[in-house]
């Protein structure tokens, strides 16, 4: 039984003239004539003028297409079973149930996609290029859920299109636009994940915000080109009945839209994820083997600055510099493994999304061109409606996949449901944590320049380092290191607070590391005393990983006074 047949209302009644009234289902007779009973599809129904069971009939032609009929005549004893009158329309109990189910379905799709968009907007650590593509997917699904599905559900419940021919064409075009944009977004995400897994360390420089914006603009341009075809006349002849509205089944357009909206993107998606699987399998083995050779996994990330003496370097200094080379190798290997594991996990999450997408959309894009080219192979109306709504179901299920597969999205969802959005002031836990006092360990001892004795450098001439931003946890009481003789540079366009939510964490990390490196290379303020006999020059700044407690203990610890005002810095 199709959705339109759910509106069928059967009643038996005797006419005032003694003849049998027609079984009114919106067909050619709701009591309007003759002894012969007629059946049809409900198109428009209004309670009869005199009979208890009379409804406004709708005439039916040989193809069982509906047209407005005449009010039913008087009928005695007419009875309507299992129906409800809503605004003058008679709807069966099953139709009411279908309407409630579709309303819950639409509300779930709207709420889920809104959660995805707000989660990225309110959490800085989720504002990455990959998540921008996910937000674009959520925007397309939200537009579909809010502008297309309500009218589709209304048509299913009423059994006919009640919004006019012009709006039918617009509705069909927006339907194709949103579905195509959603599918192309999944295609873009798969390419982005392949780049992230294949080039995990170079990914921030390869996939920039500017490139992402250009890709998204091209994506929506392609979706618009695919969707405007029927508006420009590439469609079937317009049916005379304005109460009928459906997707265009013209053979040429059906094949074109299926290729551009589904088959080509699906081919790219399958190829990209096959490549992701191959790269992930080989890279994981090589990285894990390298880390095992270097004894264990990363426990802590620290900043080590490799220095060399500008005049007479001691053996101790050269030994310290040589010993850090192994640490640098191990840290880069471990950091690469950690970075790659995050990329691989994100790829797994998005692979689930793509798998569900294929299951939801493949039946529709298989049946549509097949039925257009070979009408005799068309499925029944009921089967086609199930396949049609299965594609819509993809827009509802995408937001449900993220919290089940991504811990970060799950936490963001929970914070939003608890009305906790800390985007403006509170900072997330830093991805990297650098300890400035390890500069002393790398140099083989306290910095000697501008030092009056064997102790640390005087507090009047500290090494200028960027102070950490305010965090949720209180830090140790340390004085802010002044910068002598330097004017604060003006803010650049990228430093405006207005653009803060659109900056990637990797961009902030790179900027802070560069600033830290430049300030360390510049050294402290000019010293009023004689030039130091032994002055060190920074050779490199790197992130190192101690692999066990014993190795971490070999790095010399210093008291707070020996830090030369180097403080823990979040980068």
UniProtKB/Swiss-Prot annotation:
Q: Does the keyword Lipoprotein apply?
A: yes
Q: What are the protein's UniProt keywords?
A: Cell membrane, G-protein coupled receptor, Glycoprotein, Lipoprotein, Membrane, Palmitate, Receptor, Transducer, Transmembrane, Transmembrane helix
Membrane topology recorded in Swiss-Prot or TrEMBL: Multi-pass membrane protein
Pfam families per record: 7tm_1
Compartments, as annotated in UniProt: Cell membrane
What quaternary arrangement does the UniProt entry report? Interacts with FLNA (via filamin repeat 21); increases PKA-mediated phosphorylation of FLNA.
Q: What is this protein called?
A: Alpha-1D adrenergic receptor
Source organism:
Sus scrofa (Pig)
